[in-house]
Amino acid sequence: SRPLVAGGICVDERAHTVFVNEQEVQLTLKEYQLLCLLMKNRGAVLTRDVLLENIWGYNNESETRTVDVHIRTLRQKLGADGALIETVRGVGYRMGEHT
């Protein structure tokens, strides 16, 4: 399978690696799964509920902060390219087209 690419972010699912501008970035399993899901659905808004269901295996309104915290740490680890993960206020997140 081909790598997932967005901006300077490159995810190789077979090798389970993430590179940002050719530097390897260490992500937790949940951060990695979040990034893959967002990149595979690039341009589409994914609600917090959809993210919870797909990554954590449950859907609970009171747990949406879990998603927000993971998105925040994921953005930090991705550096400037973290800005590609856009917040859609009151809805969820999407992987944007450009930085």
Predicted feature residues:
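Basic, amphipathic DNA-recognition helix from helix-turn-helix-like DNA-binding domains
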Residues: S1-V5
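Positively charged, aromatic-enriched patches within helix-turn-helix-type DNA-binding elements
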Residues: A15-G82, T87-V91
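C-terminal edge and immediately downstream basic/flexible tail or linker adjoining helix-turn-helix-like DNA-binding
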Residues: R94-T99
